[in-house]
Design a protein with these regions (language model features):
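Residue(s) in the substrate-gating loop at a strand-loop-helix junction
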Residues: 160
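Short-chain dehydrogenase/reductase
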Residues: 2-95, 109-110, 120-121, 213
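Substrate-binding pocket helix/loop in short-chain dehydrogenase/reductase
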Residues: 112-114, 121-126, 226
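Alpha-helical segment proximal to the catalytic Tyr-Lys
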Residues: 142, 189-193
Length: 244
């Protein structure tokens, strides 16, 4: 990056791809604002149906510590635009502007065909996986666009292979990830002449807690069963996604 002291914001930063991305950015010299759910919000955690256990404040502190002195934990829910705006304001007030945003917050729920999917599953998958990306993009992009020319900000959303093909019994999750791909395509067109870019990564089966939840939803013994279905013959390591 052109700036001497670049700044990155990562959502879903407590575990998995988000934590790996934060650590990678810190190793490259970025000051990293790690955003994930607060420890003191068990009610919000229990709203997500199914076996997935979202990360919380303790995980977030550990992920920030893994970034050395460059990681700073910020407790916020990506479903809450006001909370995200407050974090972004804090980051800008301390560091001036934002260079990179990684929207990695996500969750998986389902395990039933579409016609048996209840409203809570649908709403939670759209709110977390799609609206969460919209919320952090809307909160952070004005700062990136206000940077003096030549701008070179980067917005990266973590979508899924489900953005390219539907996953049975995960209609809501698949719809949300297709939505992320569409959102980023539109955003990329809007940013075309700004110097700021927007991209999405669409990983397949990655060794994270979300894959454990997916295995449970499909009645698999553990996530290793997905390795047999992977084209590369194994699960993807989160750090491999963070390195892209």
């Amino acid at each position: 990056m052109a700036r001497e002291n670049p700044v990155a914001v990562v959502t879903g930063a407590a575990r998995g791809i988000g934590a790996a991305s934060a650590a990678r950015l810190a190793a490259r010299g970025f000051t990293v604002a790690l955003i994930d759910l607060p420890l003191e919000s068990p009610g919000r955690l229990s709203e997500i149906p199914g076996p997935y256990r979202p990360a919380h404040g303790q995980d977030l502190d550990e992920a920030a510590a893994a970034c050395g002195g460059r990681g700073h934990a910020h407790a916020a829910d990506v479903r809450d635009p006001q909370a995200l705006a407050k974090v972004i304001d804090t980051v800008i007030s301390h560091h001036g502007s934002i260079d990179v945003v990684v929207a990695a917050a996500g969750a998986v729920a389902g395990g039933a065909p579409l016609w048996e999917t209840d409203d809570d599953v649908w709403r939670s998958m759209i709110d977390i996986n799609l609206t969460g990306v919209f919320n952090i993009a809307r909160a952070s992009l004005p700062s990136m666009l206000d940077a003096p020319a030549p701008r070179n900000g980067r917005f990266v959303a973590v979508a899924s292979a489900a953005a390219h093909h539907g996953l049975p019994q995960l209609a809501a999750y698949s719809a949300a990830k297709h939505g992320v791909a569409g959102l980023v395509k539109a955003l990329s067109a809007e940013l075309a002449d700004s110097g700021v870019t927007a991209n999405a990564v669409c990983p397949g089966s990655t060794a994270t807690g979300m894959l454990d939840a997916s295995a449970a939803l499909y009645g698999m013994k553990n996530r290793d069963a997905f390795a047999d279905q992977a084209r590369i013959g194994r699960l993807i390591d989160p750090d491999e996604i963070a390195a892209t």
